Amino acid sequence: MSANHMTPGEIVSELDKFIIGQNRAKRAVAVALRNRWRRQQVAEPLRHEIHPKNILMIGPTGVGKTEIARRLAKLANAPFIKIEATKFTEVGYVGRDVDTIIRDLTEYSIKQTRELEMRRVRSHAEDAAEDRILDALVPPPRGASGEPERGEDNSARQTFRKRLREGKIDDLEIEIEIAQPMPQMDVMTPPGMEEMAEQLRGMFAGLARDKKKSKKIKVREAFKLIVEEEAAKRVNEDDLRAAAITNVEQNGIVFLDEIDKIAARQETGGADVSRQGVQRDLLPLVEGTTVNTRYGMVRTDHILFIASGAFHLARPSDLIPELQGRFPIRVELDSLSAEDFVSILSETDASLIKQYTALLGTEDVKLEFTDDGIRRLAELAFSVNERTENIGARRLYTVMEKLLEELSFDASANSGEVITIDAAYVDLQLAETAGSQDLARYVL
């Protein structure tokens, strides 16, 4: 089922597969996504007046703020970009211009739409690729004009077509004309002139377009290259751009991370001028403006903005009032407990335990995690967070990597073995490191 037709409850259930807890944040993003579908059902001109309710997530690092937004975008198959607010500065200062957020989002949408269109025409492209490879192997008869005549396959072509589909001639070398790849050119421009750089790249890429060269390659590689070339021919670039821009305008999601770092704090000066400048530059994007991209004009009125920050040193009220008003939905995310760590390790769809079990399984090493082993691992990770910097669930990555360090290194020597990870094994590998505050600070 498409996420666009899912109820908020169904969206939360999908998010539950990957993120533990944080129900308030999940409910907020689920309602925001459902409201997009509701808006599409409203008749014009009222539809145009309904704007998304942007969300401000407040919570420490590693509790799932980014993951919620990323999974939501994946669920909705929507253009999504995550950017650090600290990378941007007020126009005139050294740093990136905030308009590049929308340009980058549009680039992502173009890529996403192109992949979708290429998949749609792939079967026709594969048929055309087969014919071109067969033309190189068994040239068709030519008519009076000298052009190849297409008709029923003769017995030789039928034989080669059958062998090609069965993969029996994959390693056979053929000489074939293929389009030259576009040159990858990097254009250096001063900050704030990214649009000019994009136009120059497009101009240089256009110089090489439609140029072909003869190349001798294996049938397997030739088939892949020709399928891509034939699929690209069948995609209408103008329609693709129009669809991609519409997708950005109606379904785009921008995740603004570290927004608390550009909040002006009362007791500091100096840099606050630039911080407030970034907020004022962001304001038109969030409330709705038109950004010029190399694919056309993009309106931001209905793009959903999700901002997040820990707000340790600043408060949401330190943001300029106009920007505060553009994020009407505020949700606080909870710090993760040891029980949450147990659930993250054992209950999520793509848990770290499943990932490491699959990785070592490729070398015929079978990992078996016991319940007490998982609990001990979670307790150690939670303990290190309490005594050093609290980096939330990201601590599980460092702890798991340290736990399986020796095993990963010697995996080939342990091929065919079953390794049981219980509490004793976890203590043996990690207790000394986790117990020492200095070691935990630098190793875990």
From Swiss-Prot:
Pfam families, per the entry: AAA (PF00004), AAA_2 (PF07724)
Positions annotated to bind ATP: 20, 62-67, 257, 322, 394
GO molecular function, one term: ATP hydrolysis activity
Chain intervals for the UniProt region annotation (Disordered): 130-158
Gene Ontology CC terms, in alphabetical order: HslUV protease complex
Main location: cytoplasm
GO biological process: protein unfolding; proteolysis involved in protein catabolic process
Superkingdom to which the source organism belongs: Bacteria
Localization per Swiss-Prot or TrEMBL: Cytoplasm
Keyword line: ATP-binding, Chaperone, Cytoplasm, Nucleotide-binding
Assembly, per entry: A double ring-shaped homohexamer of HslV is capped on each side by a ring-shaped HslU homohexamer. The assembly of the HslU/HslV complex is dependent on binding of ATP.
UniProt function note: ATPase subunit of a proteasome-like degradation complex; this subunit has chaperone activity. The binding of ATP and its subsequent hydrolysis by HslU are essential for unfolding of protein substrates subsequently hydrolyzed by HslV. HslU recognizes the N-terminal part of its protein substrates and unfolds these before they are guided to HslV for hydrolysis.
HAMAP family: HslU
Family listed: Belongs to the ClpX chaperone family. HslU subfamily.
Name listed for the protein in its UniProt record: ATP-dependent protease ATPase subunit HslU
High-level lineage: Bacteria, Pseudomonadati, Pseudomonadota, Betaproteobacteria, Burkholderiales
